Amino acid sequence: SGTTLTEQILASHSQVQGGGELTGIIRVAKELGKTWESRGNLAPGSDEMVAQDLRQAAARYTDMTSHLWRKRSRFTDKMPMNFLYIGVIHLLFPKARIVYCRRNPIATCLSCYQILFGTGNILYSYDLTELGQVYKIHERIMEHWLKVLPERVLEVEYEQLVERPETEINRMLEFCGLEFEPACLDFHSLDRPIATASLVQVRKPIYKTSVDHWKNYETFLEPLFNALGLNASNGDSP
């Protein structure tokens, strides 16, 4: 979906430290859930208790990421599953900026399908129908947050980013409250560890060849098209 490329661009800025796929938000969200579940029905006056819980959770995440924010004034957390926790993120860090990386749904799902993730919570990536179903759920969730938090969530389309990089990069930086720096256009020169399948992509200047890469496999993707409610002829909505 372009998350690695987007993070590499932002991490090329002098004020941003790239954090990669962090698990901290998921961990503190689960801890909050367990805490609140253990109390059953919250008693009167629970607003103060919840506020204290949120402060403690925010402090815990801040402590988990201290190795990042001590280096630069901002850092990125590009865990893809963070879209499930945008509400929690906003409660813990109301000033956080969320960049929603979006790409053609067929291209996104095929990219997931072609990667051997191993065991875990993304076994749906081995089935085209399930992939499409999960993607549709993700779309509905993001439609909600784009409406509810328009000033905190920015949608960036991969196709637009590779077509007009300078315009889109400026838009991202402005959203994040950062001044433009030429290094963000020269992101492929940044030497930092990248532990994702998109490593090769960000070691080169922006290129467009991957935009329609999915069309090479189009005849095999009928279950995915059906699950997404798209036309196989062009990947668009019927």
Ranges and model annotations:
Residues 89-112:
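Conserved phosphate-donor/acceptor-positioning beta-strand/loop module used by diverse small-molecule
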Residues 23-25, 105-108, 161-163:
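Conserved nucleotide-binding/hydrolysis micro-motifs of P-loop NTPases
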Residues 44-73, 109-155, 162-238:
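PAPS-dependent sulfotransferases, especially Golgi type II membrane carbohydrate sulfotransferases
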Residues 1-93, 97:
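Phosphate-binding active sites in nucleotide-utilizing proteins
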